[in-house]
């Protein structure tokens, strides 16, 4: 009967449900407390005795993957942190609790040696040219204990030679007495020299752009979108209620290149449930720092309990972000409107994902998530007989499967009526330019996940303040009952004349060069006890 009327019955269940175990992300590494790869036991014992190494003071906050190395950052918030920029040799340590190896070496992790070392690193980024971007905050301590032995400095390493190829100190005009920068986004244009980095000043309320080619930076400050929302400063994580009401612009992600040759930068203040956006055409232009207010776009709120500190977007426009209040990782497909019904949860774990501090997507479209129980570390006491820090991984396709972010999911578009591409692609046309990047990394063997058991049937639409939505009839036509438009990606694109260009056509008009006379416009156990199909196939076969 429903088919005759052209309707599909879709059951939507609120996220206000009991906690569940994560089924998609798989634990790769875990620690009760961090350990470092000292040159020998004698030096390690000396560091322990002197207080240069205090294991209980080390908290990992950032993760990034490249080749056979998994980078982990450990800020010097407390005494006894022997190295801030480290990595795991994944050839030697497939799983377990490996020692962290200082990168590129021990000497380069000396606190206070401003010109030659990194004092404190937070989140880092590997670009498609094989370079590791690290912002040294130059700080030791946190909050009222903070000292600044060194200035903020951009450090870039060549990962093929493991040498630093650039150090750039941020000038005083780009910071202020309240500056705290913990996030970075890297924008590569037509070649490796056409590179920009963007830094979010969380407590100084600004956005700093740096040009690799010009070796110069500038600051955007005159925007209220960088500030916290006074109604969103209350947090609840791991049973701890606390207020981070001063936390401004924090997490950032970059879209794929749009048809006008620029990307879209998405960002959120930490004390906020809302996302904002701006074209990198604006950020790349030093002359626009004071007159670009109306070039920034405010998007909708994500919904309740949706504070986020980290976000990343794939090259086909799928954004992943941590949901620190929900012990979860969320998703949004950027070809869809930024509204709660188009946000999904790819995984949740009320033990393993307590404060998923960082989320990354690597060159092979594998996702990496680091969780660290940060509020417990800062505001209470960690139990060092328990597992406190974890790094998870899964293929991106596995994570978004059966969520609203998977546009191939028939629940969000009827079969045999509209051909939905497997991935959102930019409109076809003559190339804007030819990228001149480094040679491609050797690709990992392609693994078929066809034999993997499907995850439990779950829905991922955000909770609506306790209201349960169920048994909604969705029309295969563009307009449903009572003239309500159906929330489907293909219908949204049809109504708005969008030709599947990700992240921006519904936000920014395609930029054209200026013309004369024309205004420019729960519960998770270890991997070997979980053995999801794809993990078992990849590592046991």
Swiss-Prot record:
Pfam families per the UniProt record, alphabetical: MRJP
Signal peptide: 1-21
A biological process term (GO) from this entry: male courtship behavior, veined wing extension
This protein's record includes keyword Glycoprotein: yes
Entry keyword set: Glycoprotein, Secreted, Signal
GO cellular component, one term: cytoplasm
Major subcellular location class: secreted
Entry-listed glycosylation sites: 144, 215
Localization in the cell: Secreted
Residues covered by region (Disordered): 443-463
Family, similarity comment: Belongs to the major royal jelly protein family.
Biological role: Controls the pigmentation pattern of the adult cuticle and larval mouth parts.
Protein name (Swiss-Prot/TrEMBL): Protein yellow
């Amino acid at each position: 009967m429903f088919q005759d009327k052209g309707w599909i019955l879709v059951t939507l269940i609120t996220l206000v449900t009991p906690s569940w175990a994560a089924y998609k992300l798989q634990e790769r590494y875990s620690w009760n407390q961090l350990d470092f790869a000292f040159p020998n036991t004698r030096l390690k014992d000396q560091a322990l005795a002197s207080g240069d190494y205090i294991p209980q003071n080390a908290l990992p906050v950032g993760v990034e993957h490249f080749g056979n190395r998994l980078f982990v950052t450990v800020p010097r918030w407390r005494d006894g942190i022997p190295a801030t920029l480290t990595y795991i040799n994944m050839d030697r340590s497939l799983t377990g609790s490996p020692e962290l190896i200082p990168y590129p070496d021990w000497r380069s992790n000396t606190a206070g040696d401003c010109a030659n070392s990194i004092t404190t690193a937070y989140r880092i980024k590997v670009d498609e040219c094989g370079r590791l971007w690290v912002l040294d905050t130059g700080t030791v301590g946190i909050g009222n204990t903070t000292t600044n032995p060194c200035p903020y400095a951009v450090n870039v390493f060549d990962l093929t030679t493991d040498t630093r190829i650039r150090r750039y100190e941020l000038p005083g005009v780009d910071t202020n007495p309240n500056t705290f920068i913990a996030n970075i986004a890297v924008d590569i244009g037509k070649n490796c020299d056409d590179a920009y980095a963007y830094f979010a000043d969380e407590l100084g309320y600004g956005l700093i752009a740096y040009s690799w080619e010009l070796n110069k930076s500038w600051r955007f400050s005159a925007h209220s979108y960088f500030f916290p929302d006074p109604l969103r400063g209350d947090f609840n994580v791991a049973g701890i209620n606390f207020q981070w009401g001063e936390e401004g612009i924090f997490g950032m992600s970059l879209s794929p290149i749009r048809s006008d040759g620029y990307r879209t930068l998405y960002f959120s203040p930490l004390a906020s449930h809302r996302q904002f956006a701006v074209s990198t055409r604006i950020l790349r232009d030093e002359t626009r720092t004071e007159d670009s207010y109306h070039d920034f776009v405010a998007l909708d709120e994500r919904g309740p309990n949706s504070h986020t500190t980290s976000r990343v977007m794939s090259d086909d426009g799928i954004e992943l972000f941590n949901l620190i209040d929900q012990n979860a990782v969320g998703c949004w497909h950027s070809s869809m409107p930024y509204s709660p019904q188009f946000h999904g949860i790819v995984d949740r774990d009320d033990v393993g994902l307590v404060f998923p501090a960082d989320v990354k997507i690597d060159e092979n479209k594998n996702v990496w998530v680091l969780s660290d129980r940060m509020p417990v570390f800062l505001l209470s006491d960690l139990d060092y007989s328990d597992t406190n820090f974890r790094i998870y991984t899964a293929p991106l396709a596995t994570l978004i499967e059966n969520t609203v972010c998977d546009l191939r999911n028939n629940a969000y578009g009827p079969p045999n009526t509209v051909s939905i591409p497997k991935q959102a692609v930019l409109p076809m046309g003559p190339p804007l330019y030819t990228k001149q990047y480094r040679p491609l990394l050797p690709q990992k063997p392609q693994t078929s996940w066809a034999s993997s058991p499907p995850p439990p049937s779950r829905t991922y639409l955000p909770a609506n303040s306790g209201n349960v939505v169920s048994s909604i009839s969705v029309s295969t036509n563009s307009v449903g009952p009572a003239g309500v438009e159906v929330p489907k990606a293909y219908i949204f694109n049809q109504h708005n004349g969008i030709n599947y260009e990700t992240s921006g056509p519904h936000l920014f008009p395609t930029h054209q060069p200026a013309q004369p006379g024309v205004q420019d416009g729960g519960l998770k156990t270890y991997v070997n006890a979980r053995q999801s199909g794809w993990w078992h196939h990849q590592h046991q076969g």
